[in-house]
UniProtKB/Swiss-Prot annotation:
<dbReference type="GO" id="GO:0005743">
    <property type="term" value="C:mitochondrial inner membrane"/>
</dbReference>
<keyword id="KW-0479">Metal-binding</keyword>
<dbReference type="InterPro" id="IPR016174">
    <property type="entry name" value="Di-haem_cyt_TM"/>
</dbReference>
<dbReference type="InterPro" id="IPR048260">
    <property type="entry name" value="Cytochrome_b_C_euk/bac"/>
</dbReference>
<feature type="binding site" description="axial binding residue">
    <location>
        <position position="83"/>
    </location>
    <ligand>
        <name>heme b b562</name>
    </ligand>
</feature>
<feature type="transmembrane region" description="Helical">
    <location>
        <begin position="288"/>
        <end position="308"/>
    </location>
</feature>
<dbReference type="InterPro" id="IPR030689">
    <property type="entry name" value="Cytochrome_b"/>
</dbReference>
<feature type="transmembrane region" description="Helical">
    <location>
        <begin position="33"/>
        <end position="53"/>
    </location>
</feature>
<keyword id="KW-1133">Transmembrane helix</keyword>
<feature type="transmembrane region" description="Helical">
    <location>
        <begin position="347"/>
        <end position="367"/>
    </location>
</feature>
<dbReference type="GO" id="GO:0046872">
    <property type="term" value="F:metal ion binding"/>
</dbReference>
<comment type="subunit">
    <text>The cytochrome bc1 complex contains 11 subunits: 3 respiratory subunits (MT-CYB, CYC1 and UQCRFS1), 2 core proteins (UQCRC1 and UQCRC2) and 6 low-molecular weight proteins (UQCRH/QCR6, UQCRB/QCR7, UQCRQ/QCR8, UQCR10/QCR9, UQCR11/QCR10 and a cleavage product of UQCRFS1). This cytochrome bc1 complex then forms a dimer.</text>
</comment>
<dbReference type="Pfam" id="PF00032">
    <property type="entry name" value="Cytochrom_B_C"/>
</dbReference>
<feature type="transmembrane region" description="Helical">
    <location>
        <begin position="113"/>
        <end position="133"/>
    </location>
</feature>
<keyword id="KW-0472">Membrane</keyword>
<dbReference type="GO" id="GO:0008121">
    <property type="term" value="F:ubiquinol-cytochrome-c reductase activity"/>
</dbReference>
<keyword id="KW-0679">Respiratory chain</keyword>
Length: 379
């Protein structure tokens, strides 16, 4: 008799995705981040749901309701900090996941890659709107500054900004709609993640060598289920340590001051995971130019498959490309640091240099280096 997991309509889907899925035998721990992102998303949805039970999206009571959650709700402080630091964990996993894709040439699976970039945009939008909800100083001014960027769009800009605000400034209407969007977007992210997996399972996973692995496949369960569980335990222990020992390490002290439209904080900056893009935005003196650079800094991921000139898929056997990849990582870390610094010399110049290097490496240096490597390997 055939096993129920292979015949039952619902079990069949689970079976072909997580149990009998043929996986390459040599995928390393860099392939763990997909499952870790799934765990992050589930954690965020659950903690967010419990927070939403006690939160009020009104300018008068929003800040107080978050304080109430931390002080009066059973384990409210734990739920709130799990949610806030869970977002940081989410982005750490996201950046590592994208970095893995770039290093090993996983972007050659076009549909999977492009949906992944859409997912990145959706998660960034969700995180931005979530940061506005506690209605602290940085929430209010962050929302004001970032939404105001849309006014750089010619002709319709100002109308668009006021339409998003629901008035002539960031106020009650803005907070209410941001809460609504922040609630719905994670479910859209979950649906997109399902499509992401669907397309991935059409082709099967890539592997570190970048070579076809059809001749050497192993079942996902038990080999990679146990490996994913280990990864999950490590991530959960890291998140728990962060939440229980230094929950405010990644936050901004300004956000413990209630929002005040009459008092601008000295340094307006987003959460750490947006600082690299914020630094690129600030490095261009023109408003529209800065906004375009900001959007392109992420959108550029979509054209990476078109810039692949190497005859090999992975960077595993391409030392020159490897060096460039790590220079790009260092450049992004530099941008992240600059994004958190005040707008003054020498930070402005460093930011401009790092921004130029970021686009140069991706658009020109990487493809040219790959072509040189082809010549050196006589391919």
């Amino acid at each position: 008799m055939t096993n129920i997991r292979k015949t039952h309509p619902l079990m069949k889907i689970v079976n072909s995705s997580f149990i009998d899925l043929p996986a390459p035998s040599n995928i390393s721990s860099w392939w763990n981040f997909g499952s870790l992102l799934g765990i992050c998303l589930i954690t965020q949805i659950l903690t967010g749901l419990f927070l939403a039970m006690h939160y009020t999206s009104d300018t008068v009571t929003a800040f107080s309701s978050v304080t109430h959650i931390c002080r009066d709700v059973n384990y409210g402080w734990l739920i709130r900090y799990l949610h806030a630091n869970g977002a940081s964990m989410f982005f750490i996993c996201l950046f590592l996941h994208v970095g893995r894709g770039l290093y090993y040439g996983s972007y050659m699976y076009l549909e999977t890659w492009n949906i992944g970039v859409l997912l990145l945009f959706a998660v960034m939008a969700t995180a931005f709107m979530g940061y506005v909800l506690p209605w602290g100083q940085m929430s209010f001014w962050g929302a004001t500054v970032i939404t105001n960027l849309l006014s750089a769009i010619p002709y319709i800009g100002t109308n668009l900004v006021e339409w998003i605000w629901g008035g002539f400034s960031v106020d009650k209407a803005t907070l209410t709609r941001f809460f609504a969007f922040h609630f719905i977007l994670p479910f859209i992210v979950a649906a997109l993640a399902g499509v992401h997996l669907l397309f991935l399972h059409e082709t099967g996973s890539n592997n570190p060598s970048g070579l076809n692995s059809d001749t050497d496949k192993i079942p996902f369960h038990p080999y990679y289920t146990i490996k994913d569980i280990l990864g999950a335990l490590i991530m959960i222990s890291m998140l728990s340590s962060l939440v229980l020992f230094s929950p405010d390490m990644l936050g901004d002290p300004d956000n413990y001051t209630p929002a005040n439209p009459l008092n601008t904080p000295p340094h307006i900056k987003p959460e750490w995971y947006f600082l690299f893009a914020y630094a690129i935005l600030r490095s261009i003196p023109n408003k529209l130019g800065g906004v375009l650079a900001l959007v392109l800094s992420i959108l550029i991921l979509m054209i990476i498959p078109l810039l692949h000139t190497a005859k090999q898929r992975s960077m595993m056997f391409r030392p020159m490309s490897q060096c460039l990849f790590w220079i790009l990582v260092a450049d992004l870390l530099t941008l992240t640091w600059i994004g958190g610094q005040p707008v003054e010399y020498p930070f402005v110049v460093i930011g401009q240099l790092a921004s130029v290097i970021y686009f140069l490496i991706i658009l020109f240096i990487m493809p040219i280096t790959s072509m040189i490597e082809n010549q050196l390997l006589k391919w």
